[in-house]
Design a protein with these regions (language model features):
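Catalytic and substrate-binding clefts that recognize carbohydrates or anionic sugar/phosphate headgroups
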Residues: 1-180, 188-190, 201-206, 519-521, ...
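Aromatic-lined carbohydrate-binding/catalytic grooves of carbohydrate-active enzymes
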Residues: 177-347
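Aromatic-lined carbohydrate-recognition surfaces of secreted/lumenal glycan-active proteins
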Residues: 183-188, 216-217, 253, 257-270, ...
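Secondary-structure transition/capping motifs at alpha-helix termini
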Residues: 205-212, 244-260, 285, 322-330, ...
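Generic beta-strand/beta-sheet core signal
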Residues: 212-219, 238, 260-264, 285, ...
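Catalytic nucleotidyl-transfer cores of nucleotide-processing enzymes
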Residues: 252, 397-413, 500
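Alpha-amylase-like alpha-glycosidases and glucanotransferases acting on alpha-linked glucans and related
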Residues: 286-329, 363-404, 465-485
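Catalytic core of carbohydrate-active enzymes
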Residues: 368-378, 386-399, 422-432, 437-604
Length: 604
């Protein structure tokens, strides 16, 4: 470690040097904050130390699942898989042993972002692609170490968290958006081919579900593996499962139901599109010159080279615009992006430098494809991986793969801190899979978990379920024992549409749709709930996150509140316990909200 000394300074410029290392720094007021440009004389690991405010909380760093406040922790700046095998094994095969929930230091993230917001209402953002570690373990300093010197740092401050968020959005635009139809009810995952999809859609409509859309991720085919039913990674309609694709999508549209699909930047080995791309040099290579294959559970796949212009054009024009949007698809999951190997060979660029940027490149390609299509304004896609700048391109993010349980490290509760931290990083519109995704052996979702998750996501920007990796052994929203709850809660989401649209307008300014309890007051000292949230400014939600619970104890933010579905008046700032029968969300609205009349009209 070589400390750099100040060797030259002027009004807005400084130079630091020692031995052969030199960094020139210039400062400029822009975007309502301070841009600090860093120009090193080479590539070298850099450590930046900033004074900390005693007692402050630190939020952000991208999608951090285990807790909101990162003070006392380290955050790794490296895009990675969130889900790992050992916790699943402990919960299932070794379930006779007590399960100890994992700490923050154990848990990776699909979406690290080098933006950090303090409870003192300032934020630091670094423009950097390299691996790094943000160290908040010291009381007197925040220490940022990167494998290469950041290109710049950005400092934002304000008199409220919303003001800081707006300044961050001025520096990196928040271009999140959802078509209005997304808020007309619930998007329910249904797989298995058009006959089954249509049957389930008809059943749900008959049962009173406000069905905004159906999401059929196996539209391109199904691959049954050792872990469950997976998608066949060949991005064109499977004519066996989904025959007469255009006509059947139109038939759903006539019922008022949208159709959603799935894509990722990989192609199953020896599939038709894999062979097409391999022949044209569109797949990423290994150092020996062959195609670099990754293994997904039990099958191999090639990776589309997103640095190769011909491959990018093929993804946009053929896979997205022709094969999906041109055939009536209204939205889709743009999965993955976190797996670029650092030892591969790309058409252009260093994979080690592009690893963190890969999810943003993937989101950018999808956004450009959607916006260049005549139906672009009616279509959205959702991503799970991200990095700095993802908010410029992804229309909405989801929290990735959660376990189908109530554990706070990988289960339903973890999506709340994860969403808060994304919001403090600049990503303002996030949702989760209703019911979770990870299911293995005895790890399967109960009817109770599904309904509690549905209660929560009725109060979110996007209400969408997942069938899990094992649809046949997990309770689904259309199952007879829960469909009445699905119907009631989908109606709640649809009734909130005018308010949710307002929340999405604010998200375009950088203000998160879902916020922690202290966001509006700005007083972090009054923070009591990592597992409750403000939806916009005027709604407070306290999901039930414990199996078997029939009540929820929570402290509401200061002010006068009214409980949804009962009209009980509640004074904020004090801890209280509320009954929570299954299917009845613990949710409140401000008594003086301009939307109070709307909220009072919402019924289960």
């Amino acid at each position: 470690r070589v400390p750099l000394a100040l060797v030259r300074a002027s009004a807005n410029e400084a130079e630091f040097a020692a031995r052969d290392y030199r960094v020139r720094m210039t400062a400029e007021e822009r975007f309502g904050g301070l841009v600090i440009r860093l120009e090193p004389n080479g590539k070298f690991m850099t450590e930046l130390v900033f004074a900390a405010v005693p007692g402050e909380g630190i939020f952000g760093g991208g999608e951090q699942y285990r807790q909101l406040d990162m003070k006392g922790e380290k955050i790794v700046n490296f895009v990675s898989e969130h889900i790992v095998v050992p916790p699943i094994v402990r919960k299932t095969i070794l379930k006779f042993l007590p399960y100890k929930e994992k700490p923050h230091s154990y848990i990776g993230t699909y979406s690290p972002m080098s933006t950090y917001t303090s409870s003192e209402k300032y934020a630091l953002r670094f423009d950097v692609s390299a691996y790094g570690v943000a160290d908040f373990t010291r009381g007197d300093a925040s220490v940022f170490r990167f494998a290469e010197c950041p290109r710049s740092a950005f400092y934002a401050a304000g008199d409220s968290f919303a003001a800081v968020a707006k300044t961050l959005a001025a520096e990196t635009p928040s271009n999140v958006r959802l078509p209005e139809w997304c808020m007309d009810g619930m998007i329910v995952a249904v797989q298995g081919g058009f006959p089954r999809v249509t049957e389930k859609a008809d059943e749900m409509l008959k049962n009173g579900v406000k069905l905004a859309g159906v999401w059929s991720q196996d539209w391109s085919g199904r691959k049954v593996t050792a872990v469950g039913k997976q998608v066949y990674w060949n991005w064109e309609a499977d004519e066996t499962l989904y025959p007469d694709f255009d006509e059947n999508v139109r038939a759903l549209h006539e019922k008022g139901v949208k159709f959603l699909a799935y894509i990722n930047p990989y192609l199953v080995k020896d599939g038709r599109l894999y062979n097409y791309c391999a022949e044209r040099g569109m797949l990423i290579r290994n150092r020996e010159g062959g195609i670099y294959h990754i293994k997904s559970t039990t099958f191999d796949a090639g990776m589309i080279d997103l640095t190769y212009p011909a491959a990018v054009e093929f993804v946009k024009e053929t896979l997205i615009k022709r094969n999906m949007l041109g055939r009536g698809v209204d939205g889709y999951m743009a999965d993955f992006g976190e797996y670029l190997p650092v030892d591969c060979v790309l058409h252009a660029g260093d994979p080690a430098e592009l690893h963190n940027e890969w999810p943003v490149i993937w989101a950018k390609i999808n956004r450009e494809a959607v916006e260049s299509h005549p139906r672009g304004g009616e279509v959205f896609f959702f991503t799970r991986s991200g990095y700095n700048g993802a908010e410029k391109y992804s229309t909405v993010m989801w929290n990735g793969d959660q376990h189908t349980d109530f554990t706070r490290d990988y289960g339903m509760p973890c999506v709340m801190p994860a969403t808060f931290n994304l919001g403090f990083s600049g990503y303002a519109a996030v949702h989760s899979d209703v019911g979770g995704f990870i299911s293995f052996a005895s790890l399967a979702r109960s009817a109770e978990l599904l309904v509690r998750w549905t209660e929560m996501n009725a109060f979110s920007p996007l209400m969408r379920s997942h069938e899990t990796i094992r649809p046949d052994v997990n309770v689904q929203p259309y199952d007879e024992r829960v469909v009445a709850h699905t119907a009631a809660l989908s109606r709640v989401h649809a009734a909130l549409k005018p308010y949710l649209m307002r929340c999405m307008e604010q998200a375009r300014e950088g203000i998160p749709v879902m916020r922690p309890d202290f966001y509006e007051s700005g007083d972090y000292a009054k923070h009591t709930e990592d597992y409750a949230y403000l939806l916009g400014s005027d709604v407070f939600v306290a999901p039930v996150i414990t199996a078997g619970a029939a009540e929820r104890t929570v402290t509401l933010p200061e002010g006068d509140w009214v409980r949804f579905f009962g009209g009980e008046r509640v004074r904020g700032g004090q801890r209280a316990t509320f009954p929570a029968p299954l299917g009845t969300p613990v949710a409140f609205y401000r008594a003086d909200s301009p939307f109070a009349e709307l909220f009072a009209s919402v019924r289960l």
